[in-house]
């Protein structure tokens, strides 16, 4: 209990995240041995936004995920950033469970595909924190 309280105090300066982001992070942990923060500032597309040409296969995973979320917005009333869904994780297998909610199923598939892609793609440490360089213009 003390550890939980201390961790909550340390998190006081962290802005709240959409619930879907937590689901994506958990999927990444399910499919992968690398932790999700490794992907927050990777390449030109991993993290918030993106521009330029993806620098490698892992960055292409993020580029594809961004476009998948854009496609989800074409489903009536679907906001992929806030949409939550049901899935199961039996490491490293992820199964999306929402069969009737088209938006939830689509967003879950976007996140599932990204998590699997991250697990398969090589991680090149020289592509971390490169957005401020000319590589992403």
UniProtKB/Swiss-Prot annotation:
Found, by tissue, as follows:
Expressed by the venom gland.
Q: Tell me which GO cellular component terms the UniProt record holds.
A: extracellular region
A Gene Ontology BP annotation from the UniProt entry: arachidonate secretion
| Cofactor(s) this protein requires | Ca(2+)
Documented EC number(s): 3.1.1.4
**Subcellular location per the Swiss-Prot or TrEMBL entry:** Secreted
Q: Which residues are annotated as pro-peptide in the record?
A: 12-19
Which residue positions does the secretion signal occupy? 1-11
Q: List the disulfide bonds.
A: 30-89, 44-136, 46-62, 61-117, 68-110, 78-103, 96-108
Q: What is stated as this protein's family in its record?
A: Belongs to the phospholipase A2 family. Group I subfamily. D49 sub-subfamily.
Q: What does this protein do?
A: Snake venom phospholipase A2 (PLA2) that shows anticoagulant and neurotoxic activities. PLA2 catalyzes the calcium-dependent hydrolysis of the 2-acyl groups in 3-sn-phosphoglycerides.
Q: What is this protein called?
A: Acidic phospholipase A2 1
